[in-house]
Amino acid sequence: MITSAIDIIVPVWNRPIETRACLVNLVEHSPGARLILVNNGSDRETENLLEEFAEALDERALLISSRFNLGFVRAVNCGLARVEAEFAAVVRQSTLVSEGWLEPLLMLTRTRPEAGVIVPRLERAPLKKEHRGGSPPISTTEVSHGDFAAMVVRKGVYDLIGGFDEEMDGAGWCLKDFSRRALRGGFLTFAAEGSPVAAVDEPLLGSAERREELLLRSAAAYRARWGEERAFCVYFPREADPDAIRQRLDLMLRGARQGHTFVVLVFPATFKVLAREGYGTLHRNIRLEKLPRLFGAGQASKIAVALGAGTPGLVTVAGVDGISAGIPGSRPFAELERLIVAAEAEKYGKVP
């Protein structure tokens, strides 16, 4: 029996033309992988297509069939339960991968053993010709959650926490919940972006009313487990000690892993140092913003108002306790620290 480096799960429900294109690309650009094809109650034409691929690939394919549609998330979990490789990828039937798409993801698993969920570079548009091949530069950063369009999951994560929550929405809330459970188990979620993967929005199934009901129920279940995700604007004055800023960015990284988002306002000299040291790409939920060189005290409020207009509920935080951010209602950093540390203890089992 051949042992593959990775098993790729593709849940399929009808749409044989898209499915064939997806599978042809996967076979061409995923050498050594085994395909786990989950026939999710498809019509006869699609069923024949899957049987054709499974027969042609022999030991490089496993076909799982259901006579009715299990739902996407349950189909993914059926595939995960049959994974034998060290890593599993989940790919939607409408996704098109390109040459070299897997290498950055698997490379990251070797250099970062705590990487539990990894997404490739996803593009919500057809791939351009210049993207089909070559070796683009690879960028790596932590992200809030995976993506069902394409992602890699370490089998050790599945063995530890189980599959995706089948009662959730099969989208953002379900993916966030999985990454939070992975975090509780000691695993992180990354994007390792090299060769692009074309992701197409899936057709919406069911009535708008039922979809909205499921979305609200999923959001409520997520918040009950993990708490509210909040947005913060953290201001550091010109005289702030760079080492203190680094320590506080490390704390914000822990908060970003819990789903919080941060806009960090720093002066140009500090911004340059932090960007050079990689603090600008710690996590997609942390954004460094460079303040104007000639920054007056009154401008802080204007910046906060502008940021708050696009982010309801934004909380302004003074990066250095005792030094006002110049914005009415700003909270001390110690309060933010207590929030993050308390969640780690209560939700993630970490001792302060």
Tell what function each PLM region has.
Residues 96-131:
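Conserved donor NDP-sugar-binding/catalytic core segment of glycosyltransferases
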Residues 39-49, 267-272:
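A conserved acidic beta->alpha catalytic loop
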Residues 134-156, 207:
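A recurrent flexible, glycine/aromatic-enriched loop bordering the glycosyltransferase active site
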Residues 24-33, 254-259:
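Short, acidic, metal-binding catalytic loop of nucleotide-sugar glycosyltransferases
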Residues 65-83, 133:
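Glycine-rich, basic loop-to-helix element that forms the pyrophosphate-binding segment
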Residues 6-18, 22, 29-30, 38, ...:
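A conserved hydrophobic helix/loop-capping motif in glycosyltransferases and polysaccharide synthases
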Residues 88:
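Short aromatic/hydrophobic "clamp" motif used to bind/position activated sugar donors
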Residues 104, 150-162, 167-196:
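A short, conserved alpha-helix in the catalytic core of glycosyltransferases
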